[in-house]
């Protein structure tokens, strides 16, 4: 009873501390380490019957990882369902499956194309060219790439036959481990020098296209030849590469080939590793452990996988990737490297890189003539079923695995002691970061979760790392002595990062190194994809009605000293407050000055297009006697290219200023009065309210408005006209007279009255005078 009571207390304490975990799969190291930290496991209930079905063999387990489980359990996956190698810390910490974003070759292929939006790096410098055969555009791009690669290979073969400057692994290719029987030699087929000329012209045209020399060209067939011409070109290429045909060339062609290859070296980052046999590796886009992978070197065979199969075309399952024909070999055997990294957060993106790794060897000597998977695939799930070739070097390990420390020692023996620290590790870190940057927006992440990934790299002869694929939930199986030690270490260090570091930011993180953490970005709340444009149509201006208007509040006056600081000099644009209304017993000119002084001081009024270009309309207001009636010409409100300046005057007119787009013969006149002649000079002494056209404005010499100032009397405000647009200039008159009967006026390069923009000419000088 005491034991049961203590167990109950222990569980209740773990529940309060949120230390409950569940494990799916075989993770004895994780279970042991969590129990040491006081966590309590919630056992999974395995129900019998049809409710729990094992996964189909054809379905992707790569979306859940390349889960090899244990080497002994790998063959018994049907009996023990392990769907996702996922362990759950009661919604606190989770291995997040992330929909297999990185495990899918399709996702990695497509995401890395967006790398230029994140960094100034070419994905082709660390990720072999990759295409989705199910997409029509990608299939066409792959066909053109295959053609161009064949043309480049012809140039390499010419140079190699002449100068032997492109060494290949002749010893490995002649190894007796090749499974393909040697064909009986016949009379060699001769290929004419015109074949080399076609390859040269295709490469030259490709270089000219990169230099944008094809902008004005209209060619139906891309890349120099027609599709039929390329088909014939490939047949002769196959004869040279695979059937031993003799490639004849002229001495002058050798130098051209060398020159063009040197130019291609600068624009094709993969020209060194791609070799000269045009081998591509075809992969199912959603499978792991090397299932369904094939190495092919004939275009027709690869296209047969998708041509005429609508299901494959729709699903886009097949991915074709350029095979690294010149990899770094260890004792004549191909190998790859498994590198772990940990993502603890996606916003901000936080990446931890594991310092230890291991390499996996193939069981067969390397050969480009033998395209069998046993030679070119280093997956342990494939190689464990094969026997080591008797032709392998005796220094290779029997279990086909090395630790990264043993690999570094081998590099020192090769005479490259700094290759690991200066080329390999920095290259792998950059490749991992770039792959995660491009996938960050497509991952359905959640807080308090993490994911451990396994990236596979192959190295070129120059030690350059090439990212092959990234697997979610990599295997933790202790298949060899190397993996037994390293896998236990990476699991223990993972818990140090995701659990211990939550309590102590300075705790030991083991072999994990923080290599990237971006600033946090606030994610806007998703409000749906509904787009809405609101507004109303612009109405056609109407003729001014004969009506009487009362005192109106003042229109917001937008002013600015020159240009800039629109928020400080345009309060009416950024706030709802209105400027004080001009009092009817005060001079309108004085009110304008006071409003102007409150905004920008006593300098010239001016506005800028930056603050006014969003304003909808312009309205000009004048003060007229309340009983005054107008007759309006029908075309008075139509914009004119050369507007005339209008002078309004009368016995009770306090602000004699306005600007209307009138012709020289158009004017306003009171009802019942005869219209004065267009060319007659207005008589300013007559106590009549009338409007007369003045001299046309010149953009270089703006003309002030001239009027008379009368005694103070009660006034009303009347609206003159509808929206007035496209004025070259506008002047505001200060009608306060001085002793010499002169008035001051303020010049504007543009004016906005009532909320709009009126483009203007040169501003007038403040303080200039004109006779009344």
Curated annotation (Swiss-Prot):
UniProt keyword terms in alphabetical order: ATP-binding, Cell projection, Cilium, Cytoplasm, Cytoskeleton, Flagellum, Ligase, Magnesium, Metal-binding, Microtubule, Nucleotide-binding
| Residues that coordinate or bind Mg(2+) 2 | 469, 471
Q: List the disulfide bonds.
A: none
Q: Where does a protein bind?
A: 289
Instruction: State where L-glutamate binds.
Output: 381
Catalytic activity of the protein: L-glutamyl-[protein] + glycine + ATP = glycyl-L-glutamyl-[protein] + ADP + phosphate + H(+)
TTL domain: from which residue to which, for each copy? Answer: 151-510
Swiss-Prot/TrEMBL GO biological process terms? axoneme assembly; cilium assembly; flagellated sperm motility; protein modification process; spermatogenesis
Q: Name one Pfam family in it.
A: TTL
Q: Where does Mg(2+) 1 bind?
A: 456, 469
Which InterPro entries does the record match to this protein? Answer: TTL/TTLL_fam, TTLL_monoglycylase
Q: Where in the cell is it found?
A: Cytoplasm, Cytoskeleton; Cell projection, Cilium; Cytoplasm, Cytoskeleton, Cilium axoneme; Cytoplasm, Cytoskeleton, Flagellum axoneme
**Which positions bind ATP?**
283, 289-290, 321-324, 334-336, 378-379, 469
Q: List where Acidic residues composition bias occurs.
A: 68-81
Name the cofactor(s).
Mg(2+)
User: What does the comment on domains in this protein's record state?
Assistant: Two conserved structural elements specific among monoglycylases, IS1 and IS2, are involved in glycyl chains initiation. Two conserved structural interfaces likely constitute the binding platforms for tubulin tail and microtubule. Arg-289 is the main determinant for regioselectivity, which segregates between initiases and elongases in all tubulin--tyrosine ligase family. A glutamine residue at this position is found in elongases TTLL6, TTLL9, TTLL11, TTLL13, TTLL10 and favors glutamate-chain elongation, whereas an arginine residue is found in initiases TTLL2, TTLL4, TTLL5, TTLL3, TTLL8 and favors initiation.
Q: What is this protein called?
A: Tubulin monoglycylase TTLL3
Q: Which organism is it from?
A: Homo sapiens (Human)
The organism's lineage is:
Eukaryota, Metazoa, Chordata, Craniata, Vertebrata
